Amino acid sequence: MEQAIINDEREYLRHFWHPVCTVTELEKAHPSSLGPLAVKLLNEQLVVAKLGDEYVAMRDRCAHRSAKLSLGTVSGNRLQCPYHGWQYDTHGACQLVPACPNSPIPNKAKVDRFDCEERYGLIWIRLDSSFDCTEIPYFSAANDPRLRIVIQEPYWWDATAERRWENFTDFSHFAFIHPGTLFDPNNAEPPIVPMDRFNGQFRFVYDTPEDMAVPNQAPIGSFSYTCSMPFAINLEVSKYSSSSLHVLFNVSCPVDSHTTKNFLIFAREQSDDSDYLHIAFNDLVFAEDKPVIESQWPKDAPADEVSVVADKVSIQYRKWLRELKEAHKEGSQAFRSALLDPVIESDRSYI
């Protein structure tokens, strides 16, 4: 079947794992708690369902008369089309045509299926597994019994995933977009930190200024970033106020060329306070960011944007994205090398 038209500059993103929904969203989509649920990734219209013990992602288009399978139902271990009842197995092959039960099923009666897994309470999809060198992004709190983990409701922005990533990792905007909320406006000059590439991740550390007048919910402390390319950010905060660990895991789904569905999971060591205080604080911070990031135009960063030394993180990020785009054109080995070859600036050891 045909592939959705996407910008050639973003074709390489098909090789990465992206979250498309929470498990809760899928369970709420149908009384069975199994789906199906319509989702969109890189302009591909997809359907997600749980068939037996397996989470499955397919193109959301029946091979028969092109009805959306996401309007259908789960029948046993199969996904049933709402129009004529054709049933598809976990591999996307049609196993039942009710109108012709005694006739051979045509060989073309199948739909494209894609890699699909559940991790951290999110459903992840990889559209192209041919290079097979990417993994679901790293979330440091996933298996830490000390931490309470909360999955927030996804939030949508009219912005690219690249712009969202840059916003989340931008040190010099704190004093201007988040004065009194997340940062002290008198601390407008951030340090220039060494950045390492290792195992398909950016890793860097930023020690925020101490004794800033911010709310207790503000995760201020030593920031340790582990950012799995291209759009995931794992931020571990060793909080100054309580000497405890707070983790933010933010990852953006590139829905199409201008829309981003964002997922935030947070975890904290001290959990005697209400989850809702932290959820409300995160929502407040994002509400401060959103209108500014959505105002950026064009949506994709143009080459004539002026950068300064304080923009090191976004400069290095854009450089790596360009390298991945070019390597993708050369094939699997070049892409693997561009993604996984280490580039170390700091004195940290990764052995």
Swiss-Prot record:
The keyword NAD applies. Its cofactor is [2Fe-2S] cluster. One of its GO terms (molecular function) is 2 iron, 2 sulfur cluster binding. Keywords: 2Fe-2S, Alkaloid metabolism, Iron, Iron-sulfur, Metal-binding, NAD, Oxidoreductase. Pathway: Alkaloid degradation. Its EC number is 1.14.13.178. Pfam families: Rieske (PF00355), VanA_C (PF19112). It comes from the Bacteria. Binds 1 [2Fe-2S] cluster per subunit. Residues 17-125 form the Rieske domain. Optimum pH is 7.5. It catalyses: caffeine + NADH + O2 + H(+) = theobromine + formaldehyde + NAD(+) + H2O; caffeine + NADPH + O2 + H(+) = theobromine + formaldehyde + NADP(+) + H2O; theophylline + NADH + O2 + H(+) = 3-methylxanthine + formaldehyde + NAD(+) + H2O; theophylline + NADPH + O2 + H(+) = 3-methylxanthine + formaldehyde + NADP(+) + H2O. Optimum temperature is 30 degrees Celsius. GO terms for biological process: alkaloid catabolic process. [2Fe-2S] cluster binds at residues 62, 64, 81, 84. InterPro entries: Cholesterol_7-desaturase (IPR050584), Rieske_2Fe-2S (IPR017941), Rieske_2Fe-2S_sf (IPR036922), VanA_C_cat (IPR044043). Involved in the caffeine degradation, which is the essential first step for assimilating the carbon and nitrogen in caffeine. Catalyzes the N1-demethylation of caffeine to produce theobromine and formaldehyde. Also catalyzes the N1-demethylation of theophylline, paraxanthine, and 1-methylxanthine to 3-methylxanthine, 7-methylxanthine, and xanthine, respectively. NADH is the preferred substrate. This is Methylxanthine N1-demethylase NdmA. It comes from Pseudomonas putida (Arthrobacter siderocapsulatus).
